[in-house]
Amino acid sequence: MTTIDKWRSKALYYTMFEFRIKGKCYVSQNYRNRQLPSKKVADNNFLSTIVDTDDEWIRQRTGIKERHLSNGKEGTTYMAAHAAEAALENAGIGADELDMIIVATVSADTYVPSTSCSVQGAIGAIRATCFDINAACSGFLFALNTAYAYIEMGMAKTVLVAGAETLSREVDWSDRGSCILFGDGSGAAIVQKDDSNVGGLIASVTGSDGTQGDVLTCKGRGIQNPFHNSKRKKDYIRMDGQAVFRFAVTMVPRCVKQILKKTETDVDDIKFFVLHQANVRILELIAKRLKVDIDKFPMNLDRYGNTSSASIPILLDELNRNHLLERGDKIILSGFGGGLTWGAMLIEW
């Protein structure tokens, strides 16, 4: 057993809520099955034993103190399925009522079947059409948009949307520039149409720039292969940190402003800006460029690190569990990441 394996946690982070299109964003208040059992996490002091770094260096540059790691048996499908089951229970519907399952992930357990198909089999959603979306840290927003489109076209009524990642197996644990950033986790939402015609998803914008794809890459994945038992250095997550920083602090304010203009919404009317949890410096500069108080930018990256497509639903769930969201609150969601991809969404809770 390696040093890393000893710190991989059985206590991964699951989250779930119910999201209704064209209606309030209704959230179940029953959290009996919200799974955050006793845990062991990899904190910054632990990372200092395997790479040349320390707690102060990591916190000052990223804001991260610790992150959850899979124990190797609890992979992306496992986490997504558990989040899905909790979301179904909180929404009060059965798995056989799902018309569709969309999983956003860049760290699938297998190439085929897709994570969504594996989740379908695990939870017994026998009627659901299933597919995955790879939009990196923007994935959850892209998946929500896709669910919305299917529902609006009358092709689905009830959709499970999940973001799930096991990034710990995609990281080069000898590279202090990247291994300090990422954690494992999952989140899921039930998306349904609500004919009350108030609240819900109001508007969204998305974008991509494939010409900048080399800025953030993962050219190999942690999938079992009898002909390739060890990963080459270039197969792990690699990124140009400065380029990603410039991209995020430029594109996110731009697409948020597009959303506000499109919906004729004043920035002061936004209760929270729920952004992908990448780096505290990125979030602080985005707030500054939008001329918004940083208190409107909730953060939990200090405890979970960058969980890619799972970060937004995890943060939304925490806000709700802490009774910080009320019916009618307007919230901006925004993701940004590899591809490059980005997006923003205005919802009413």
Question: How should each PLM-predicted stretch be described?
Answer:
Residues 57-78, 105-159, 288-315:
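Conserved catalytic cysteine-centered active-site region
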Residues 314-334, 340-349:
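Catalytic phosphate/nucleotide-handling subdomain of diverse soluble enzymes
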Residues 2, 13-15:
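Short terminal hydrophobic/aromatic SLiMs and anchors at protein ends
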Residues 17-72, 175-246, 250, 254, ...:
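Condensing-enzyme catalytic core mediating Claisen C-C bond formation in acyl metabolism
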Residues 152-186:
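Flexible, glycine-rich active-site loops centered on histidine and acidic residues
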Residues 34-36, 104-109, 135-138, 163-168, ...:
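Acidic, glycine-rich active-site loops and adjacent beta-strand->loop/helix elements
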Residues 83-99, 254-271, 319-324:
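Phosphate/pyrophosphate-binding loops at sites that engage ATP/ADP/AMP, CoA/4′-phosphopantetheine
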